[in-house]
Structure formats: C-alpha cells, structure tokens
C-alpha cells in the first residue's frame, strides 16, 4: 500500500513529497500553501526564510478574524508570521527538490503546481485548571502533500 495523493501527477515530469503527522496548525498550513503555490522552489524557500525571519508576512485570506494588518502584503491586509509551519514547509520543499534532482530535473527551478494540507487528527493534551480540574488542550496533526513540475516539460 503506497501513499495516496489527492491529485494524479505525471511521474515523467513531476517530483512529489509529503509531510506526515506533523503537529502544525491546519489554518497556518492552508495560508502558506496558497502563498507558495505557483512559485519556483527557490522563490518559495526564499519567501519562507523571510517569513521565519519576520521580514515578510503570509496573507491570511481565510481564518483571519482578529488577525492584524500588515503593510508588506500587496492587495490584502490581514497577515501573520507562522514560524513553526514555515519551518516544516521548508523541510517539505527541500525533500521535494531533492526528489526532483534525483529524477534528473533542476530542483530549484521546478514550479510548485500542487500543495495541499490535510487534517489527520488531534493529539490529546490536558491543561490544568483551578480546583484540580483539567480541560482538553489538543494539538492538530496535519499531512501536507507537494507536487513540483519541471517548467521545461510543460512547454
């Protein structure tokens, strides 16, 4: 039984990678996915490193209630700096780039054609409260799939 992706990809022109069971926010993952889709791997890695450094924010077009406005986003106002999810996305892109290089493609120039996070479940946790009680304080577990395509193969 192999790993199933949500879309079909031509193995001759694409490289794939997937993050499995990562404790990152699904909402942050969705925002990052929308921001990096369509970019080359080099552009996306540079963008995510700027997000981690706090120089560039990720636009939150969905799940943006109470999210502060950022002046560095063109055409949108709400944005954040999802540090933890950005680090995991960098690992995903590095893995996908290396898979593309192994297939004989130029890894940094490959285009991100598909990136999709999926909620897998929750890891149970407890938060202590007053009078000896405890409340559920669960952590979201996500899978993220990524497909890169060789730009010369689409021409």
Which positions does each model-derived feature cover?
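Generic structural signal for short, solvent-exposed loop/turn connectors between secondary structure elements
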Residues: 106-107, 155
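Low-complexity, polar-biased intrinsically disordered regions enriched in Pro/Ser/Thr/Gly
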Residues: 72-78, 124-132
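Ribosome large-subunit tunnel/peptidyl-transferase-proximal elements
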Residues: 2-106, 147-148
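C-terminal edge-of-domain segments
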Residues: 132-155
């Amino acid at each position: 039984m192999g790993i199933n992706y949500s879309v079909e990809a031509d193995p001759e022109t694409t490289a794939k990678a997937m993050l499995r069971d990562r404790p990152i926010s699904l909402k942050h993952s969705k925002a990052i996915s929308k921001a990096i889709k369509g970019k080359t791997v080099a552009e996306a890695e540079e963008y995510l490193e700027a997000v981690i450094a706090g120089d560039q924010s990720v636009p939150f077009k969905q799940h943006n209630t109470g999210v502060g406005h950022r002046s560095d986003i063109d055409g949108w106002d709400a944005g954040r700096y999802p540090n933890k999810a950005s680090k995991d996305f960098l690992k995903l892109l590095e893995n996908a780039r290396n898979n593309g290089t192994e297939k004989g493609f130029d890894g940094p120039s490959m285009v991100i054609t598909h990136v999709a996070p999926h909620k897998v479940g929750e890891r149970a946790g407890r938060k202590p409260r007053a009078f000896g009680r405890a409340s559920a304080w669960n952590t979201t577990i996500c899978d993220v799939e990524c497909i890169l395509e060789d730009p010369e193969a689409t021409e």
